[in-house]
């Protein structure tokens, strides 16, 4: 989500479809939730039961419930509880934290079943709901999503039955970085660049 890249693509790749990968735009939403968590829990005037457990399991607040550990845990009290129930029990102690948790879970649910033809209306609704939130972190997220909305919606376009993704490009970048790590072994850069092209062509043939 960088305007410099978008400007370059528009200037040089006129027929390209610009799409922002879900990983990148969802990162803004999850960071907003975690920022709310940090702000709320830093208030020394508030007491939170099970705070120490949440401090080591904070990622669960912004994890899709379907990816939670599929097992039960036993508390010191002898009570058996699921991971989701323990997280939800914790966030219920603060209205803003509970709202943030439920909001991100609702968005996970909506996006998981969203199709391209409904993407525009769905994102308009989500952005409006974030913008009207009393949490400043969600308001900032809504501004960012609104700015890049066209490219976020494009991520739902399918090509060969797969959504547009920067996964293949990230894979190439990873290979280039690995080759750069051993670049000192080459006497000139021409051999290095030829090696990159060779590796990429071998991968294409598999």
Residue ranges and their predicted role:
Residues 30-42:
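Short, surface-exposed amphipathic charged segments that create phosphate/polyanion-binding patches used
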């Amino acid at each position: 989500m960088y305007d410099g890249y978008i400007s370059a693509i528009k200037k040089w790749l006129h027929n390209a479809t610009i799409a922002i990968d879900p990983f990148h735009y969802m990162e803004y939403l999850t960071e907003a939730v975690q920022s709310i968590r940090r702000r709320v829990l830093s208030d020394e005037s508030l007491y939170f039961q099970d705070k120490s457990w949440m401090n080591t399991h904070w990622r669960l607040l912004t994890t899709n419930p379907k990816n939670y550990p599929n097992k039960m845990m036993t508390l010191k009290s002898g009570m058996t509880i699921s991971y989701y129930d323990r997280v939800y029990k914790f966030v219920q102690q603060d209205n803003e934290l509970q709202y943030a948790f439920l909001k991100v879970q609702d968005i996970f649910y909506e996006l998981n079943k969203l199709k391209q033809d409904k993407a525009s209306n769905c994102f308009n609704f989500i952005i409006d709901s974030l913008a009207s939130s009393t949490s400043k972190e969600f308001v900032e997220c809504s501004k960012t999503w609104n700015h890049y909305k066209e490219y976020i919606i494009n991520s739902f376009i399918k090509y060969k039955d797969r959504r547009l993704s920067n996964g293949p490009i990230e894979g190439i970048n990873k290979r280039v970085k690995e080759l750069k790590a051993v670049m000192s072994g080459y006497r000139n850069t021409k051999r290095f660049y030829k090696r990159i092209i060779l590796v990429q062509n071998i991968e294409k043939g598999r």
